[in-house]
Amino acid sequence: MATLLSALGAAASGMDAQAMRLRHLSENIANADTPGYQRKISTFRIGDDGVALGPVRLDDRAAARVHDPGHPLADASGHYDGSNVDLVLELADAREAQRSYEANLRIFDQARQMSQSLFDLIRR
């Protein structure tokens, strides 16, 4: 029984971590056109209760230089720092996070069904 509860806990923590990862990815996508925005990178750590979201890092890649002389942030040459968000990468990461979430959900559901079957057997 403890193993089933561990599986439930691990799957639930995995779903929580992937949900937070999706949140950070959606923030990156929403701010892709925000000047000076740095992409957030989610990290994970293994804890006693399963997986958890680790510290969020900022991507240190250089931001794209955008030429727009009329922009309020433009320097004398008409350039300003855009964001370092790559939408293709963010969408691929979001798809991966969604699939990881769904896999954890299936594990959670299977463990729940197994524990329910065990309880039904004990009641007989």
What spans do the regions from the language model cover?
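Amphipathic alpha-helical polymerization modules
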Residues: 1-124
